[in-house]
Structure formats: structure tokens, C-alpha cells
Curated annotation (Swiss-Prot):
Organism for this UniProt entry: Mycobacterium sp. (strain KMS)
Record's protein name: Large ribosomal subunit protein bL21
GO cellular component: cytoplasm; ribonucleoprotein complex; ribosome
BP GO annotations: translation
Signal peptide residue numbers: none
MF terms in GO: rRNA binding; structural constituent of ribosome
PANTHER family per the UniProt record, alphabetical: 50S RIBOSOMAL PROTEIN L21, LARGE RIBOSOMAL SUBUNIT PROTEIN BL21M
Entries under NCBIfam families matching the protein: L21 (TIGR00061)
Record's keyword annotation contains ATP-binding: no
Record's keyword terms, sorted: Ribonucleoprotein, Ribosomal protein, RNA-binding, rRNA-binding
Job description of the protein: This protein binds to 23S rRNA in the presence of protein L20.
Quaternary structure annotation from Swiss-Prot or TrEMBL: Part of the 50S ribosomal subunit. Contacts protein L20.
Length: 103
């Protein structure tokens, strides 16, 4: 069984292993920069680490590959019998990360 970690960023949690490429909420880092992510859980074979004092020693590092946008979401507000229509679109800004290490 390979080792992996659960990291927290942008109000969400992601399961990552070394070499994984994940899209996370936008981070304030330039492409090519190295970032460190807070860890919620580490699994290394049969060993599961979830205690806060043990997780403080663990670091998940990654490299920012690029900044991109997610799919377009269309919002349409409508009120009956008044002629009120409001259309809006949104594309969430994302950061593509490559996990380089779990130590």
C-alpha cells in the first residue's frame, strides 16, 4: 500500500500522494514556486497518523504548475409574473499543484 496524505487548502480536503497533480482553490504563488500544505491525516502503509503533535512534524510540499479557471457556471435568477430575469456566469480560479514530497 502506498503512502498518502489528506491536506487542507481553500476550505477543502484533498487526498494526495507523491507525484499527484491536483487542482486546488487559487493560491497566491507564482508558477514554479514551492508551497507547503497543512496536513490533516497521513497514511504510510498500515500506519495512520492523525494526532496533532505528530502531524506538526509532517510536511507536504508541492510545486505550482499553473493558474487556470474551472468550468463556467451559469446562474439564472427569475421572478414569476414580474418580468425579472438576471443572468450571470462565474469561473472559479484554480491552481494546479504537483505534489513533490510527504516528509
Amino acid at each position: 500500500m502506498a503512502s498518502y496524505a489528506i491536506v487542507k487548502t481553500g476550505g477543502k480536503q484533498y487526498k494526495v500522494a507523491v507525484g499527484d497533480v491536483v487542482k486546488v482553490e487559487k493560491l497566491d504563488s507564482e508558477p514554479g514556486a514551492s508551497v507547503s500544505l497543512p496536513v490533516a491525516l497521513v497514511v504510510d502503509g498500515a500506519n495512520v497518523t492523525s494526532k496533532a503533535e505528530d502531524l506538526a512534524k509532517v510536511a507536504v510540499t508541492g510545486e505550482v504548475l499553473e493558474h487556470t479557471k474551472g468550468p463556467k457556471i451559469r446562474i439564472h435568477k427569475f421572478k414569476n409574473k414580474t418580468g425579472y430575469h438576471k443572468r450571470q456566469g462565474h469561473r472559479q480560479q484554480l491552481t494546479v499543484l504537483k505534489v513533490t514530497g510527504i516528509k
